[in-house]
Amino acid sequence: MKVQQYRLDELAHLVKGELIGEGSLQFSNLASLENAEVNHLTFVNGEKHLDQAKVSRAGAYIVTAALKEHLPEKDNFIIVDNPYLAFAILTHVFDKKISSTGIESTAQIHPSAVISETAYIGHYVVIGENCVVGDNTVIQSHTKLDDNVEVGKDCFIDSHVTITGGSKLRDRVRIHSSTVIGGEGFGFAPYQGKWHRIAQLGSVLIGNDVRIGSNCSIDRGALDNTILEDGVIIDNLVQIAHNVHIGSNTAIAAKCGIAGSTKIGKNCILAGACGVAGHLSIADNVTLTGMSMVTKNISEAGTYSSGTGLFENNHWKKTIVRLRQLADVPLTQITKRLDHIQAQIESLESTFNLRK
């Protein structure tokens, strides 16, 4: 199979960059600075990578004008303001796309479902009653769309995905393998020592340009819908409980868990393994560092942390012992000790004229 190649001047045009060098050069792929060969295009994202760039074998470099001045021994460049963004754009040029359309013979499609002629439905896909699949959408093998599910245009649904509960996906949504959208939320009413299941009557609404990784669970609402606004990106192994509302362009890293009826604002970042308790509200532009545990509302933008960073093991054990000892000391006693120490410091400053 012949590898598709692209001219350097064509690639520069796609990212609105300035071409310096030989525009007719052909490139078969993007590559890292370390592993690039002469038929590869690479990028330099900051001065810290200049040493690698100087010894790289790449045929051309995506750089800023300032970074180019540090690479006089190189000949071919695409000059842009943001090399990383240009790289992101060009990954889609070299990405291997699925060009098939139509419905595979092993797929099971309910007669009432509306499937675009430009969509692709893979082997052993099951699509239920009154479903809709939009133009240019790809649904890979063994995926199941239960009744009344709607998938918009230009979506990609990977294999072994389940979409249920009448979920609605807008355009350009990407969902990766083994994720469940619209599953039953964790709702139970306690009575007389038993848990009584609450039927989950809501759905899931997913906006444009949302990306959801593998092995995620996004539960449908109990009454109101679970909502992911436009541009939300979610890593693998994330749990989003019923009635959660996530604002546009929020990013959630792997192993995060968000309990029911919590609202997260726009442009937030949840780093890996964060936990968010239920029925809370988080403002726009909030960043939670890794393993943070949110137990109360966050009303102001900013960066928040909890938990303990890594210690050498013996140091960690000593710290835990001290924390336990501290917990046994009444707060009033600690306050008195601090007041006494402060008084001693002020007395010394006065005696030796150390006060500024």
UniProtKB/Swiss-Prot annotation:
Q: Name a GO molecular-function annotation.
A: N-acyltransferase activity
Q: Which top-rank group of organisms is this from? A: Bacteria
What's its top-level EC category? Answer: transferase
- Provide the Gene Ontology terms for cellular component: membrane
What are the EC numbers? Answer: 2.3.1.191
| BP term (GO), one | lipid A biosynthetic process
Pathway annotation from the record? Bacterial outer membrane biogenesis; LPS lipid A biosynthesis
Q: Which InterPro entries match?
A: Hexapep, LpxD, Trimer_LpxA-like_sf, UDP_GlcNAc_AcTrfase_non-rep
Swiss-Prot/TrEMBL catalytic activity: a UDP-3-O-[(3R)-3-hydroxyacyl]-alpha-D-glucosamine + a (3R)-hydroxyacyl-[ACP] = a UDP-2-N,3-O-bis[(3R)-3-hydroxyacyl]-alpha-D-glucosamine + holo-[ACP] + H(+)
Keyword vocabulary terms for this entry: Acyltransferase, Lipid A biosynthesis, Lipid biosynthesis, Lipid metabolism, Repeat, Transferase
User: Is GTP-binding among this UniProt entry's keywords?
Assistant: no
Record's Pfam families? Hexapep, LpxD
Q: Which residues form the active site?
A: H242 (proton acceptor)
Q: What is this protein's function? A: Catalyzes the N-acylation of UDP-3-O-acylglucosamine using 3-hydroxyacyl-ACP as the acyl donor. Is involved in the biosynthesis of lipid A, a phosphorylated glycolipid that anchors the lipopolysaccharide to the outer membrane of the cell.
Q: How does it assemble?
A: Homotrimer.
Q: Which family does it belong to?
A: Belongs to the transferase hexapeptide repeat family. LpxD subfamily.
Protein's name according to its UniProt entry: UDP-3-O-acylglucosamine N-acyltransferase
State the organism named in the record: Acinetobacter baumannii (strain ATCC 17978 / DSM 105126 / CIP 53.77 / LMG 1025 / NCDC KC755 / 5377)
Gene name? lpxD
